[in-house]
Curated annotation (Swiss-Prot):
Taxonomic classification: Bacteria, Bacillati, Actinomycetota, Actinomycetes, Bifidobacteriales
GO terms, biological process: glycogen biosynthetic process
Protein keywords: ATP-binding, Carbohydrate metabolism, Glycogen biosynthesis, Glycogen metabolism, Nucleotide-binding, Nucleotidyltransferase, Transferase
Protein name: Glucose-1-phosphate adenylyltransferase
PANTHER family reported for this sequence: GLUCOSE-1-PHOSPHATE ADENYLYLTRANSFERASE (PTHR43523:SF2), GLUCOSE-1-PHOSPHATE ADENYLYLTRANSFERASE-RELATED (PTHR43523)
Nucleotide-binding recorded as keyword: yes
Pfam families found in the cross-reference section: Hexapep_GlmU, NTP_transferase
Classification via PROSITE patterns: ADP_GLC_PYROPHOSPH_1 (PS00808), ADP_GLC_PYROPHOSPH_2 (PS00809)
Family, per entry: Belongs to the bacterial/plant glucose-1-phosphate adenylyltransferase family.
Length: 414
C-alpha cells in the first residue's frame, strides 16, 4: 500500500426510502430536507470533504431529479484541483434492470472506479445524520492489514434486526469474526449483553479485493447483491474484515454530549426524533460546530423576522430552530424546526413540529407533533396533529407514536 494512497469515495444514494413516505413520494431519500436548511445528502458529503476526500461519486436511482439538482448547485469544486462530487444515475451497463442492491450498484459502475484507479474505496450511505472523520478509519484500515473494514457502533440489542451485527475476534479486537445482516436473534456484547456492535453502513476496501468480491457476488446464485448482507460476510468468512469503532472517532469542536452521535433516519419516527435532538438546550447533535461544518446551499434569503408584540399576539419562538426567510407574525412556535420561507400568522400555534420550506400557517391554526412537507398551507382555524381520527380521514400519515405527516403542496382546510 502506498504511503499516501489514492482514495475514491462512493456514496450509496439510490435507496427508495419507502419507510419515509410520504416525504419520499416526490424525491429520493437523500434529498429529503433536514434540520431546517440541509438535505440528508449534505451530511455524508460534508464528512467526506472535511476528511480531505474530494473525489466523490454519488450513485443515484429513484426520483433523483431534486437530488441531482442539489448536488450540482451546492457541491461544485474546481476541476483544476482534481476535485469533484459527481452524481451517477443507474447505468444499466450490465443488464437492463435497476440496481439489484448496494453491491450491484457499485459493480454496475465499476468502470468509473477503473478510470480513477484508486488504491482504496470509501463507501458510505446517504441517509444517516452524524459527523465522522473518515481519514481516521482509513488509517486504521491500512495499519490493520484488512482488505475490508466496517464502521461499527453500539446499539440496543432489541434493534439487532435493523442492522448488520458484528462479532469481534477477541484475540484480534480490530478484526471481525462473524457478520450477520439483520438477524432475528443474536447475543449481546460480552461487556454489555443489552447491546450489539452494529454496522453503520460505512466501509473501507482495498480496490483489488473489492473488485474480486463484487465479481464473485455478481455470479452467485444465492445473493441479494448487498454490501451488508453479502460482501461484508464474504470478507469476514475469509478473516479479511476489520472493524472500526466509531466511538474512537475524534471530531474537532465536538462535546461530550454530541461525541459519536449517529442516527439512522430511515423511518418517520427516527427522522422526527433526530430533529428533536437538534433543539435541546444542549443539543445531542450540534449543528453549530464550525470546526467540522455541515455544508449546504446558503441562498440569498433575508434574516428571520418576528413581529407583533401585543399581550395576546406576541410573535415568538422558543427552544426552536428558525431558518432564514421565516416570518413569525404574531404566532407562537415552541420546540420546533422551521425551514426557510415559512410563515406563521397571528394566534397560530406550532408545537413539537417540523415545517419544511414554504409552509404557511394562517391565523389561529394549530400544529402539534407533525411534519409538514414543502408548501403545505393551513387555512384559518385548521389543525394538524390535534385529532388523530380527523387526520387519518383526510389521508394524512399518522405513525403509532402519534406523529402526523402532511404531504407536499397540501392545502389543509377544516
Amino acid at each position: 500500500m502506498a504511503k499516501n494512497p489514492k482514495i475514491l469515495s462512493i456514496v450509496l444514494a439510490g435507496g427508495e426510502g419507502t419507510r419515509l413516505m410520504p416525504l419520499t413520494r416526490d424525491r429520493a431519500k437523500p434529498a429529503v430536507p433536514f434540520g431546517g436548511v440541509y438535505r440528508l445528502i449534505d451530511f455524508p458529503l460534508s464528512n467526506l470533504v472535511n476528511s480531505g476526500y474530494r473525489q466523490v461519486v454519488v450513485l443515484t436511482q429513484y426520483k433523483s431529479h431534486s437530488l441531482d439538482r442539489h448536488i450540482s448547485q451546492v457541491w461544485r469544486f474546481s476541476p483544476l484541483l482534481g476535485s469533484y462530487v459527481s452524481p451517477v444515475p443507474a447505468q444499466q451497463r450490465l443488464g437492463k434492470h435497476w440496481y439489484l442492491g448496494s453491491a450491484d450498484a457499485i459493480y454496475q459502475t465499476i468502470n468509473i472506479i477503473e478510470d480513477v484507479q484508486p488504491d482504496i474505496v470509501v463507501i458510505v450511505g446517504a441517509d444517516h445524520v452524524y459527523r465522522m472523520d473518515f481519514e481516521q478509519m482509513v488509517q486504521q484500515h491500512i495499519e490493520s492489514g484488512a482488505e475490508f473494514t466496517v464502521a461499527g457502533i453500539r446499539q440496543p440489542i432489541e434493534e439487532s434486526n435493523q442492522f448488520g451485527v458484528i462479532e469481534v475476534d477477541h484475540d484480534h479486537p480490530n478484526m471481525i469474526k462473524n457478520f450477520q445482516e439483520k438477524p432475528a436473534n443474536t447475543t449481546g456484547l460480552p461487556d454489555n449483553p443489552n447491546q450489539i456492535l452494529a454496522s453503520m453502513g460505512n466501509y473501507v476496501a482495498n480496490t483489488k479485493a473489492l473488485f474480486e468480491a463484487l465479481s464473485l457476488d455478481e455470479k452467485a446464485a444465492d445473493t441479494k447483491h448487498d454490501m451488508g448482507g453479502d460482501i461484508a460476510p464474504y470478507f469476514a468468512s475469509r478473516n479479511e474484515a476489520g472493524v472500526y469503532d466509531f466511538n474512537s472517532n475524534e471530531i474537532p469542536g465536538s462535546t461530550a454530549t454530541d461525541h459519536a452521535y449517529w442516527r439512522d433516519v430511515g423511518t418517520i419516527k427516527q427522522f422526527y426524533d433526530a430533529h428533536m435532538d437538534l433543539i435541546a438546550y444542549v443539543p445531542e447533535f450540534n449543528l453549530y460546530n464550525q470546526d467540522w461544518p455541515i455544508y449546504t446551499m446558503s441562498g440569498n434569503l433575508p434574516p428571520a423576522k418576528f413581529v407583533h408584540a401585543g399581550r395576546d399576539r406576541l410573535g415568538h419562538a422558543t427552544d426552536s430552530i428558525v431558518s432564514p426567510g421565516v416570518i413569525v407574525s404574531g404566532g407562537e412556535v415552541h420546540h420546533s424546526v422551521l425551514s426557510p420561507n415559512v410563515r406563521i400568522h397571528s394566534w397560530a400555534q406550532i408545537v413539537d413540529s417540523v415545517l419544511f420550506d414554504g409552509v404557511i400557517i394562517n391565523r389561529r391554526a394549530r400544529v402539534y407533533k407533525a411534519i409538514l412537507d414543502k408548501n403545505v398551507v393551513l387555512t384559518e382555524n385548521s389543525t394538524v396533529g390535534i385529532d388523530t381520527e380527523h387526520d387519518l380521514a383526510r389521508g394524512f400519515t399518522v405513525t403509532p407514536d402519534g406523529i402526523t405527516v402532511v404531504p407536499k403542496n397540501t392545502i389543509v382546510d377544516d
